[in-house]
Each structure stands twice: as C-alpha cells, then as structure tokens.
C-alpha cells in the first residue's frame, strides 16, 4: 500500500518528534515544515532540520516567518493597541502563520492532510484547527490528542515510544514550558502554575533589575500610516525593527509581566511573559495616536480593538468580522504619521517626545496656559456643557 502524504508542523521538540514515527506507522509519508517566526538561532534551525531527517521525514522545509508575522499580526495588533483582557500581548499568534506555511506546503505536495503536535488541553489546538478549517477542506490529524485518550502521562509515553524505536531524546529537561518567537517569550509550569512568585529561572530575554544599565536608553521610531518604518533614522523592514527593539529594551527589563486570564477552553491560565519590543512599539504608537486622532476616535477605537484581540486570541483569525475590523483600524491610521522618542531607565518605557505634521494643537492654544478665545466664551461653554447635571442638582435639592 502506498503511503499517504501528510504535512506536519514541526518544531523539533518532543511532541512533534513523536509525531513522525507515529504517523509513519499509520501509513503516512511525513513531510515536515518549520516556520521560523523568530524564536531560534541558526544552530537550532540546523538541529531541527537534522532531527526531521533522523526521524525519517520524507522531506523538510524551513520557512522564514518574520515578514508574515509582521504583516499578518504585528501591524494590525499595534493599530488595535490593546492586549487580551487589557494585559496579554498575544505572543503565540505566530500559530496562524505556521498554519499558513503548512497549508502552502500541502498545496505543493497535492495533499489535503495536515498534522500538528498540540495537546487536547490548551489554546493552540483551537487556533490550529479553526485556522485550518477556515482555509479549506482539510483532514486534521492530531497524534498527541489521540494518545491522550489512552495515556495520562503522555510525555513519558512519547519519550519511551521514541527510545524503543532507537531515537534519542534531548537530555536537557526544562523546568518551564517556554514559547519564544519574534513577538516575545511566554513561560508556564512549576511555581507559575502553583500561583507562586516566579523564580529567577522563569526569565527569558529581560534582564533582572541588578543587571540594568545605569545610563538611560533613548530611541526614535518613525511611523507612516501607523506602521513603524525606521529606527533612529534608519529605514528597516518591520520585523527587523521589532527584533532590534527586543534586544535594546530587554536589557532594561521592559515588557515583562505576570498574566492570569481566561483561556479559550474555559480554564484560568497563568504565565510569565516578556515582550520588550512589542510593548515599546505599542507605547510609541499610542503616544502618536493620542496626539493626532480626534477625541471621538480615541474614545471609540479601543472598543473595536478589544473585539479584534478577542477574535485572534480565541482562534477566529480568519473570521470575516476580524477582516471588517481591520478595515476600520487601517482607515484610522491615515494621519498616524510622525516620530516618537522613547526613553527607559529600566522596567518601563515612556514616550517623551512626539513630532507629527498632524498634531491636533490649535494655533494660539496651549492646555492650561493660553488660548485664542475669551473668558466669556469659556464660561458659556462650561454652562452649556454641564447643563444636564446642573438641572438635575437644582431639581433634586
């Protein structure tokens, strides 16, 4: 019987390593795809490719996911300007770009069968499956979910399964579950899951306070229609700007937090996250928006943005409503042009200067200092503006 081609989203970790022989023994020719979304170096990329070959993959491709993650997620996320439940900056949204890479490979191979290594307990399975289903009529195979029906200690089972077939398992044991990409780092497990204070081991990019530089860091970002296009006067692709911001602001411990929130499947989730570049980018963009958008725009946009963030978090990346909201967000950015200077001395980042041809500062008017209207006009405005509250007070004394 000839093997059926299947495309596996592959990371080289235990779960996806297990998937290759598991799928082969069920009649599949396994083609692996690694979408590099910024979480590995050249040495790790080389390991992943060799690991796929060692495990018997029929083919392996590595895809540069940096440009896609910038266009597909970072731009609209910065336009939205909101974290999930007001805090979490959606750091595993690269999953949608991984799905895109896997489906492109499936199209090249002429197969409609896709596999992933998600468990049956987390959010990622929802994001993977909904994204695949939204993009076509594909069969989804999830080996880890399948073995969880029969085995409670799945990782121990996976390790034994590989060892019995002569495949080694990486010796290093991690105290935490870590996700890392261009957007940032998330950590869970250990004392984090026990609702205790995270230990110093629960640290990825962000330097501890004791290691912060003594001199302040100042950088300038240039925006064109809401998109960062230059850093300190040098034009760069967006993904490179974000990578540089990660490096610069991580030294000062910027963008680190502990987040507790509601998962897609209804459980409470607790993680440590680090997003120095993304938080810095959001801070600069928000300062520019505050200066150039109208009062009504700045009031209304967060309501729409929250819905966009919820859709992305919950797996509805390809829902038409998300597309509709993005059209509004893009329209709102037509005047978000200018430069913002950021400064940090450690732990937080502030926008300390804004320059734009669209600043909404009326000529002759400076807040609380001077104005080109008279005292009588100010008194008349106050009287009319507060009329409803004044009448209520008079009637109900």
UniProtKB/Swiss-Prot annotation:
One of its GO terms (biological process) is L-arginine biosynthetic process. It is found in: Cytoplasm. It catalyses: L-citrulline + L-aspartate + ATP = 2-(N(omega)-L-arginino)succinate + AMP + diphosphate + H(+). HAMAP family: Arg_succ_synth_type1 (MF_00005). GO terms for cellular component: cytoplasm. It is an enzyme of class 6 (ligase). It comes from Xanthomonas campestris pv. campestris (strain ATCC 33913 / DSM 3586 / NCPPB 528 / LMG 568 / P 25). Pfam families: Arginosuc_syn_C, Arginosuc_synth. The gene is argG. Belongs to the argininosuccinate synthase family. Type 1 subfamily. L-citrulline binds at residues 88, 93, 123, 127. Gene3D superfamilies: Argininosuccinate synthetase, chain A, domain 2 (3.90.1260.10), HUPs (3.40.50.620). Homotetramer. This is Argininosuccinate synthase. NCBIfam families: argG, PRK04527.1. L-aspartate binds at residues 119, 123-124. GO terms for molecular function: argininosuccinate synthase activity; ATP binding. InterPro entries: Arginosuc_syn_C, Arginosuc_syn_N, Arginosuc_synth, Arginosuc_synth_CS, Arginosuc_synth_type_1_subfam, AS_cat/multimer_dom_body, Rossmann-like_a/b/a_fold. ATP binds at residues 9-17, 35, 117. Its EC number is 6.3.4.5. Keywords: Amino-acid biosynthesis, Arginine biosynthesis, ATP-binding, Cytoplasm, Ligase, Nucleotide-binding. Pathway: Amino-acid biosynthesis; L-arginine biosynthesis; L-arginine from L-ornithine and carbamoyl phosphate: step 2/3.
